Amino acid sequence: MAPNMRKSHPLLKMVNSSLIDLPTPSNISMWWNFGSLLGICLAAQILTGLLLATHYTADTSLAFSSVANTCRNVQYGWLIRNLHANGASFFFICIYLHIARGFYYGSYLYKETWNTGVILLLTLMATAFVGYVLPWGQMSFWGATVITNLFSAIPYIGQTLVEWAWGGFSVDNPTLTRFFALHFLLPFMITSLVLVHLTFLHESGSNNPLGISSNCDKIPFHPYFSLKDLLGFMIMLFLLTTLALFSPNLLGDPENFTPANPLVTPPHIKPEWYFLFAYAILRSIPNKLGGVLALAASVLILFLSPLLHKSKQRTMAFRPISQLLFWTLAANLFILTWVGSQPVEHPFIIIGQLASLTYFTIILILFPIISSLENNLLK
């Protein structure tokens, strides 16, 4: 009998073991779809980004008009730009839901997979930030100025670090050039990190909603989950194209329709919606260095998840008190996102401070305590 090509060919063999004959737990739900959706987001962003880069000019005097030219004169340039800008939003929606799934079902106990995932999130955030600067509108310019300026809070080397990042004494042409270079490079770095992430995942196999070993009940990835993923792709691409065609500027900032002007400060400087929760935490602390540390901690705290797991059960599926705490945390993140979009005045200041305190308290203190309590209730 002739050997099966996909099982014997050196390259096809790798694809086969990762996407076709991969043993998968039979009971994984739609929450396990977001990994593949993130893959589609990454592919779409690289494709649209590459097409946009062919028409973009990384120069302060031409950047804004080159983006306008892409939208007006390049065939389907407006569509490519809208898909790229809104694709970033969908990327973050998917990654936040993916992290939430991992947090809820205890996937962080696969430490290597989880840690590479957190590094992926940080790289994605860096990519989105430098990308937001490229259109060189008012919010692009002032967002870059404010966020890069945060590094000046680092004792002793801060100011030197900021000037080194800027390539001068303010955000100017060298800054835009290097941000474009970084925005082009980082997605490929993300792609390589994704391969590392998947390698670690396939070492242990997928977790499942019950959080117990599924070795006795596994099914091949194809056709069962490839078809299930396809449904997810169709839903997400439908939502993305709907947003890009009907309301492309819904999630953007109107200030970015004005070319960057270093002499005029916008009334309210804020980042894109997906960074607002971290921005609210940054603003809630009056001290600059304290704010920067809280901002970093708001994301880096994810690295501590495996260490803070005190429950005898892996998932929250059968832990009602932890579930209540989880959804309180989710609501708290929505409050932080809302506060981050509001001006710095009463009552938003105190709401932001309380929500920031609640965020860290739930993750660092309440989750371990409640887990231990639930362990005692099992006795």
From Swiss-Prot:
Cofactor note: Binds 2 heme b groups non-covalently.
Biological processes per GO annotation: mitochondrial electron transport, ubiquinol to cytochrome c
Known role: Component of the ubiquinol-cytochrome c reductase complex (complex III or cytochrome b-c1 complex) that is part of the mitochondrial respiratory chain. The b-c1 complex mediates electron transfer from ubiquinol to cytochrome c. Contributes to the generation of a proton gradient across the mitochondrial membrane that is then used for ATP synthesis.
Name listed for the protein in its UniProt record: Cytochrome b
Keyword Iron (UniProt): yes
Subunit composition and interactions: The cytochrome bc1 complex contains 11 subunits: 3 respiratory subunits (MT-CYB, CYC1 and UQCRFS1), 2 core proteins (UQCRC1 and UQCRC2) and 6 low-molecular weight proteins (UQCRH/QCR6, UQCRB/QCR7, UQCRQ/QCR8, UQCR10/QCR9, UQCR11/QCR10 and a cleavage product of UQCRFS1). This cytochrome bc1 complex then forms a dimer.
Ranges annotated as spanning the membrane: 34-54, 78-99, 114-134, 179-199, 227-247, 289-309, 321-341, 348-368
Family stated for the protein in its record: Belongs to the cytochrome b family.
Organism name: Cyanoramphus forbesi (Forbes' parakeet)
Required cofactor names: heme b
One example GO MF annotation: metal ion binding
Bilayer topology term: Multi-pass membrane protein
Keyword vocabulary terms for this entry: Electron transport, Heme, Iron, Membrane, Metal-binding, Mitochondrion, Mitochondrion inner membrane, Respiratory chain, Transmembrane, Transmembrane helix, Transport, Ubiquinone
Pfam families to which the protein is assigned, alphabetical: Cytochrom_B_C, Cytochrome_B
Binding site for heme b b562: 84, 183
Record-listed a ubiquinone binding positions: 202
